[in-house]
Structure formats: structure tokens, C-alpha cells
Amino acid sequence: MSPTYLLDNNVLVFLQWGDPHFQFGPIYDWVDQMAESGRIHVPEVVLGEFKNKERKQWFEDRPHLCLKHDDDQDECLATLVNELPAFVDPSKTTEDGDQPLVSAAMKINMLGTGAYASGPAVVVSHEQRRKAAYPYLKVPDACDHYCIRCINFFEMLRMEGVLTI
């Protein structure tokens, strides 16, 4: 079974400000092709975090890329927040896409395998696991809890044979 990749906001920001070879070039065509085939998604809440108007418009013009939030994700989100209360930082005053990102992966796995873990979902994030002194979990920590693979953008490109170094 081919993986289904879910992109985090920090990957979108990386594509905007990262290596100039990736900006507005063939990498976006590849992302679009992967989205058309159902292999790459950006959860709706995560896309809502993206602030660059021009790039955000590019994503919004491709509805096949956006993974709409639904009742199944809400159920996964409730489970996630209940099982991992340290994944929610109560001091944040804006909606955070981290929890919906992981709950979307849980939903895809549940639909594919009947369990939250060991399914086709792969979270793509540049976030690092939390440091011991930090009180809240990060995306990779929550993915670890549910045995959801969490990789960075370059690892995804390598897995798909796009990047060969």
C-alpha cells in the first residue's frame, strides 16, 4: 500500500522560504500530481495557518490537495486530546493545526486498517521531538504514540524517488 502524506504548515513555510530551487518550480508540480492521485494532502486547519497569500492561493486553487475536516477526524481528535493531554498547549490563543494534522493521520489509518497505528498515513513535518524541559508534546511525539510515521520533506522526496542523495 502506498503511503498517504499529510503536510504540516512548517513544510508549506519551508517550500515558501526554503531552497530557491524548490520555490514555485517543479516541486509544486510534483506535489500537485501527488495530490491529484490522492497521495498528498494538507489538512484544512493546517492550510488555514498558512499566511502567504500567493502560496495559499496556489493551495486553495487545488481542492484535491485540501483534506476537509469531518466527523471522523473529530472522533480521532477527541481520542488524541483525551489520551495525550500534553499535546495541547493551553497558553496558545490561536487554533493550532498540530492536533488536526495527527488526527487526520489517525483517521486515514483507521479507514485503511481499522486501527490508528500502522496504516498508510505518513506525517510530513519539520518539527523536532520535544526537549526534556519542554512541557508539551510536539507532532513527532504524538505520531510516535500512535506508531504513525513522521518524516521531513526531504525524506518524503527520497521515499518517492524524487531526491536521490
Listing of model-derived features with the role each one plays in the protein:
Residues H41-E44, C143:
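Short internal beta-strands
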Residues L7-N9, P43-V45, G97, V124-R129:
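Short His-Asn-centered micro-motif
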Residues S2, A115-A121, Q128-I165:
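Acidic, PIN/NYN-like endoribonuclease modules and their adjacent C-terminal/linker elements
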Residues M1-V42, E49, K53-E60:
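Short, well-structured N-terminal submotif of metal-dependent ribonuclease cores
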Residues T93-V123, K138-A142:
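Acidic, metal-associated active-site segment
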